[in-house]
Regions:
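Exposed low-complexity, polar/acidic, P/S/T/G-rich flexible segments that act as propeptides
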Residues: 665-700, 806-835, 925-942
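Aromatic-lined ligand-binding clefts that engage carbohydrates, nucleic acids, or primary amines
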Residues: 610-627, 655, 718, 739-765, ...
């Protein structure tokens, strides 16, 4: 199949097609579920799916490629082809999808890569090797070779980072050399004007507002002939442990409004991001940008149209209806031109976009006000409507719906399906609303109906009128016409029932809810110009999808199978003989550890017995600390703090750390940040966490950091109080704090946790740093150099100058550091870091007991899976750690999570199951239960 494009659309062997796509990530979905998910995509009206291709999934270890199980990319592509779904492939090399390290493999650190997403030679050498392999896979499955891939994305949202034109040109040349199908750049913020190669095909991400972004993309495209592409229409927000700031998902009306605006502006491709939810299994959950404790949850759902559990949400049902409407108007949407004449629409407060193709006109209306508006639009017929605040709606006039029938106008949306020699027109509305369909031509009526329907013949054709029933479980109206040799069936149903419709053109089947529509009929002939009121017997659905009672879910309580707490684990670690030197400042991967969990041992001398206060400013991300077999607590950014009190003896002391790199940044300037012990451990120090006690001042005009010492500004005095996280102020806000540097301090560091808040930091009137920095850092570490400090014995002033809202600012901390701890540091993997099967073989499992840190094991049995739709694990007493099920790494768990449970893939379950929990925070033992949700009202998928 040959793919071309022009300014209106993509053409497939010369035929225009409106592309409705959605993200379905094969690597986030168990392979056994792929077919069901893709079928659901088709049921929702999609004719394409989009997927990222993560480098770290396919080459987790350098030169060792993985294409098995959930990494079976070609198997996924072949399945899409079998189901007649097109594919948009997004192989990166960077991917922006809440995935660990942006899809980069950890071993790039060991390969010497330091500058990611740039034209740096070391980075590009690794990228070229990856693309040679992966683009070869995609090339074998491109449309010209009979595969499903018709479009490929280069990189991802590069407009959000500092520009490197040489890097983008190199990638574009590489992609075009390997592929014979269109490639494009995706823009997250087209207002920046960067992120692409001039003349390249462009796509854009959309959230709630589409107009300005689409206009800007057209400007960037310039004279280059290309269709308008929405490469990412946001339908959901990823969920993050301990961070609910982005949990507000998009509702279906919000998504529908953006869809309507996109096609009104002429979009020929719309990709929903995402369509299907999934899971961040294993170590692949990315770290977010909203503070130290922001990590992607196991569940990658956030309100996707098809949930992580495979359940259709109202978004999927609404999308199915909208996509059928769009297909009915497809040729008119793609072939039309925008017209700018005065529009026959009142009131004037409405925003109107009109498109025209031949005699067909489509009017897209938008109510931008905060009030409900009643209006009228008149082309040939007068249509009255009501639009809620912010609502968008489209009306088509003179639209050909079958070879012998045109719709002059209609008060309600509809779609058309062709089943052999029969055409079905489904019209939907809310109970109590009145429908008027104005058709062309004189038709013979063949009727079977459940309520009164008025059919009037007139000079221009006929008018069909009805009222939508408030009886949701009944088929409201079914009227059949004959137009020449073709039967035309009108179904007038509630929106809920229309959302449940499915069609099988090959078999001539139409299903509403769970009932197949009966096409048997009685003939009743209408004379031209007659006025007929049709009232026949009711046609009741066999089952109402919305009111039937679902079978009760089965809850199975897992039976405890033992503890392997810290004492046993420590003994095993201390007895190991494979300890090796551990380097401060190097990533775990640089030191040969292909895991995020290792044992680290510090040996140091103390001149005398007593207590040491150690500071760990560079520990990423947390470590359980042990001394003389005792659990001292968690240290690090995810622990109780960066410092630790340690009782020591005179002579050699040993501190054992179970270091856990909890997740790698998925984007931003911290992408590529190393994991491990990145700075020395300091012998003595103080951490001042400035979360309250701020002096702050508000100003309406420009604020310069030099004015921090002024007692007043613009007549406003300094105010004393906490700096709220949700403080919203216009203009500028300045906050200041006094501090003294202890005599013993050797170094002073400032850690600023400010999300994406724009802020300048000044020390004693001199600029110390800017946040975010040039690369968009969300967390900044500043070394406070000696020249910024006054006389060490004097009081110093730190000032923060916020430009705009301060929402997202968490806190800042000053670290006063003593001398570096003179320590011998070594490490070993231990089975704490290896796979969990070694832990299960341990002979030191205790049947009962308590522990502060360690493994907890439980077992449970599975009911017959043929009756199970989904399984969900609940851990009511858990804290933070890692989960395994039957040898599969489910991912990380956290008590501050987002949701009531965690998905257990059915394909990973056995009749008897082993659940293993690594607990690092809440203590042991645990409790666990699994809820098995039964299959209920499954769709009759064609």
């Amino acid at each position: 199949m040959k793919i071309t494009f022009d300014t209106k659309s993509f053409l497939f062997d010369g035929q225009r097609r409106l592309i409705l796509s959605g993200d379905v990530h094969y690597f986030r979905i168990p392979k056994a579920e792929w077919k069901d998910v893709l079928l659901q995509a088709k049921q929702a009206g999609l004719n394409a799916i989009s997927t990222y291709v993560p480098w770290n999934v396919h080459e987790p270890v350098e030169n060792k490629w993985c294409f098995e199980e959930e990494a079976d990319l070609e198997g996924f592509l072949k399945l899409a082809k079998q189901l007649d779904l097109l594919v948009i492939a997004k192989p990166g090399p960077f991917i922006r999808t809440d995935w660990s390290f942006g899809g980069f493999p950890n071993w790039l650190h060991a390969a010497g890569v330091r500058h990611f997403r740039t034209s740096d030679g070391t980075y590009m050498a690794a990228v070229d090797k990856y693309l040679d392999k992966m683009l070869g896979v995609l090339a074998r499955n491109q449309s010209l070779k009979g595969g499903p891939i018709f479009l490929v994305q280069i990189e991802d949202a590069f407009d959000l980072v500092p520009q490197d034109p040489a890097y983008l040109r190199h990638l574009e040349n590489k992609f075009k050399k390997k592929l014979q199908i269109p490639v494009y750049f995706n823009l997250a913020d087209p207002s920046s004007g960067g992120g692409f190669v001039k003349g390249a095909l462009l796509g854009v991400n959309l959230d709630k507002e589409a107009g300005q972004s689409l206009k800007r993309v057209r400007e960037l495209a310039g004279t280059h002939r290309q269709p308008l592409m929405v490469s990412g229409l946001l339908t959901a927000r990823a969920e993050y442990w301990n961070d609910r700031s982005e949990r507000a998902s998009r509702t279906w009306p919000e998504v529908e409004n953006v869809l309507n605006e996109a096609v009104a502006q002429g979009a020929a491709l719309v990709n929903l991001t995402p369509f299907a939810g999934g899971s961040n299994f294993g170590e692949m959950a990315g770290r977010g940008l909203s503070g130290d404790r922001s990590f992607a949850a196991i569940s990658w759902d956030g309100g996707a149209p098809l949930s992580e559990l495979g359940v259709k949400t109202p978004k999927a049902l609404g999308l199915g209806l909208w996509s059928r409407w769009a297909r009915t108007l497809e040729s008119s949407l793609l072939g039309s031109e925008r017209i700018n004449e005065d529009h026959p629409v009142i009131p004037s407060e409405l925003s109107v976009v009109a498109r025209e193709q031949g005699d067909t006109r489509i009017y897209f209306l938008h109510n931008p006000t905060s009030e409900t508006l009643n209006g009228k639009i008149q082309v040939d017929e007068a249509l009255h409507f009501t639009l809620a605040p912010g609502e968008r709606r489209a009306y088509a006039f003179n639209l050909g719906v079958t070879p012998n029938l045109s719709a002059r106008a209609c008060t309600h949306p509809y779609f058309v399906e062709h089943l052999g020699t029969r055409s079905v027109i489904v019209l939907w509305g809310e109970p109590g609303q009145k429908l008027h369909f104005y058709g062309s031509g004189t038709l013979d009526v063949v009727s079977r109906s459940s309520d009164q329907i008025l059919v009037e013949h007139e000079r221009k054709g006929f008018v069909l009128s009805a009222e939508f029933s408030n009886r949701a479980q009944r088929l409201l109206a079914k009227v059949m016409f004959e137009a020449g040799q073709r039967e035309v069936l009108f179904l007038i149903v509630t929106r809920h029932l229309a959302e449940q419709s499915s069609f099988d053109p090959a078999k001539g089947r139409l299903v509403l809810g769970s009932s197949e529509v009966d096409f048997s009929r009685k003939m009743a002939r209408l004379e031209p110009g007659s006025r007929t009121l049709i009232s026949v017997e009711e046609a009741t659905l066999a089952e109402d999808y919305f009111t039937a009672v679902a079978p009760e879910a089965k809850v199975v309580k897992a039976q405890p199978a033992g503890l392997l707490e810290e004492t046993a684990l420590l003994k095993r670690a201390e007895a190991r003989t494979d300890w090796a030197p551990f380097s401060v400042g190097k990533d775990l991967a640089e030191q040969g550890y292909h895991t995020d969990r290792v044992w680290v041992r510090l040996r140091f001398n103390a001149a005398q017995a007593g207590k040491k206060h150690l500071i760990f400013p560079g520990l990423e991300d947390q470590a359980a600390a042990f001394h003389k077999g005792q659990f001292l607590g968690l240290v690090g950014r995810l622990g109780t703090g960066l410092d630790l009190d340690l009782p020591v003896k005179a002579g050699v002391n040993e501190l054992l750390l179970a270091l856990h790199a909890f997740g790698r940044y998925s984007e931003g300037s911290k992408l590529g940040e190393k994991k491990g012990l990145l700075l020395p451990v300091f012998d003595g120090g103080e951490v001042q966490n400035f979360a309250d006690g701020w002096h702050f001042l508000e100003a309406a005009g420009p604020l310069d950091f030099q004015i921090f010492s002024a007692p007043t500004f613009s007549g406003r005095g300094w105010e004393l109080g906490a700096l709220p996280k949700t403080l919203e102020r216009s203009g500028y806000v300045c906050a200041r704090k006094k501090f003294k540097v202890p005599d013993w301090a050797k170094r002073v560091r400032l850690n600023l946790h400010a999300g994406d808040v724009r802020v300048q930091v000044a020390i004693n009137g001199e600029l110390a740093g800017t946040h975010p920095d040039a690369r968009g850092a969300q967390f900044q570490e500043f070394e406070i150099t000696p020249h910024l400090i006054k006389d060490p014995k004097a009081e110093n002033t730190m000032a923060l100058f916020f430009k705009g809202p301060t929402r997202g600012f968490e806190h800042c901390e000053l670290l006063f550091l003593g001398p570096e701890l003179k320590a011998e540091i070594d490490a070993c993997p231990g089975y704490y870091a290896a796979d969990e099967t070694e832990a299960l073989k341990d002979k030191n499992w205790a049947k009962t007991g308590k522990g502060r840190w360690g493994f907890w094991r439980a077992q449970f049995k599975t009911p017959p899976l043929k009756d199970v739709a989904a399984a969900v694990l609940t851990l009511p007493k858990h804290g933070r750690g890692v989960l395994w099920l039957n040898g599969h790494n489910l991912g990380k768990h956290w008590k501050d999570g987002v949701g009531e449970g965690m998905k257990l893939p059915l394909s990973w379950l056995k009749p008897a199951n082993d659940l293993l929990v690594l607990e690092e925070e809440a203590g042991l033992p645990h409790e666990a239960s699994v809820t098995f949700h039964p299959k209920f009202n499954e769709e009759k998928l064609p």
